[in-house]
């Protein structure tokens, strides 16, 4: 732990001596006026020196209550952000996990709390995940949890009776000590579903025998109710590929067939005499994709499974399913997307007959975004709401709320737009039929923030910001979750200050209850020297693009500072936001007085489709140009040291950082890339094809987008490459190909390998990763003090 040394400044002012004039015989005559003036001047000089010392003394020496943020701090318990995992059980009850680990039920109307599970229960069963049954009688506890991909994990489970404390192991029939791919409660009573060996099992209640709903499951080939790698990472953004009807009587699920998909082998190097490999289906750009089918199974009475068919125009072509949602107890809405990702069709299917009708079709000249969005339906299904791109003059298209009215007899649809403007609707949260209001999150107040709004669906469409006045000094970035009947909502303040979770009444949002304040983290941060970020706006090609500078707390613009530029991990993401952030780069700012910059150029999200889709067929081109323009702007600032510039990126961010480092603009002294994508042909089909098309038709586009060409440009920079050998997202193959080309070009590099670690390293390796990155940038960016040659002493 770095300690701040205590420094004291001693200034000694001595009175001048009285000097007799030599050669004078007359008695000494004192010039009292002159002496007084001289003493006054000396006192003024002493005062000025003392004042300047105080002013120039760093803050940590004058304010002992604040200390610098260290890497060790990030791993302390009081620096952990607590997520209460709050969820609605019904319209008045919320279940959440308190900061001390108890699972509690809160009634929002009476403020009465009920302890459902003590924190010691987690210790007893070594459980790290929990889920409370809908009837609040049982808890599902997961232990021996092992992460598979980004969202998926395997675990063993026990069922715990809250009242009697009885415990049951959850196992498939005739199997003991099973490891399950998934387990969760249904929507009614004690319904249970779990997935074992890629097959779905169902229990009507905890005392009943398990019923196997599918039998086609085959490891790494046929997936039932659970996603394969491509669907989990790039399409559903979840490992869950099944959906309950509201009454719990039916289950919709995907069957993903990877039998023709090429497989990737991930070797495991440690822990055995001979390394073993994990083999799993991973379609790269242009390769065979998984095929997909959507089924609905009836859970009551004789088990009956029905397939829901794609639209006619998709039956003879490759497609994805990106969204499934129940509209009523028997109807589902499904979104089908072609492989090129520029045509999507929304259908509503009657699951008793299998009949599906097309409700809306979207097309794009580039690609379609927001394809996971779930439409919000009225109870009778006569209208639904979702966001669609709407043109806003020269600024291009922005996502806005549209209301779709279905004519019952003709099945024709009338569309009415409820919002408009140069801002984005992020998500539609709820529709209250009593008040005829729609609730949604938007960027209307600021593209960097998220506020909760309501809008009337009738008459003048009056729009109102619900969250704008809630803790406005602390919160400008929100998410929300409404209760089943929309009478109450959970409000999640996610920044810029320490996150807070609160409960509100929809009728009177100003009345609230704080569920989680993260007070421990708040107190810990108050003791640290953490500065506030500054926002600057850059004008590039008629776009206004945001640049964020995170400055040291004791920043002074007359000093010179090193700069670290951080890249985003995904296209369509957003780095410059009001979200709370504290990570390894916060330590670099504090400990090494480095300025950290983040810039959302073309290809970034939530600023309209025109900015986002500039990267179509130009991945690795316009983003590089914009980031370099941002750096050149920063170099005009007097406090940026042009000789101490650095860059960092992970995944796609590592790809952009590599493209910048090898460009003709030699701006950076060093750079670090973690798990960098180096060739889009080696990456996932759904990702690469979305932005660049099929390799067979776009060979030159893929060549231009590759890091592996002209790597001679990396000769002048100091580069650190970091990669886990078990990365299932960006395979180690990417770094291996890059290193091969660097060696051929005679480029020096530093490599940090994490054996058997994935795309996100485990907790046990995180400290080492962070310290490696920090040491690299600290060494690279430290101020070079030129030592003047010592002059030889002259002989007397």
Curated annotation (Swiss-Prot):
Modified residues (Phosphotyrosine): 138, 143
SUPFAM superfamilies tied to this protein: alpha/beta-Hydrolases, DPP6 N-terminal domain-like
Extracellular side: 56-796
Membrane topology note: Single-pass type II membrane protein
Region Mediates effects on KCND2, annotated ranges: 1-56
InterPro entries xrefs: AB_hydrolase_fold, Peptidase_S9_cat, Peptidase_S9B_N, Serine_Prot_S9B/DPPIV
Localization: Cell membrane
Known tissue expression: Found in serum, T-cells and brain (at protein level). Expressed in brain, pancreas, spinal cord and adrenal glands.
Family: Belongs to the peptidase S9B family. DPPIV subfamily.
Protein name as catalogued: Inactive dipeptidyl peptidase 10
Organism: Homo sapiens (Human)
Gene (UniProt): DPP10
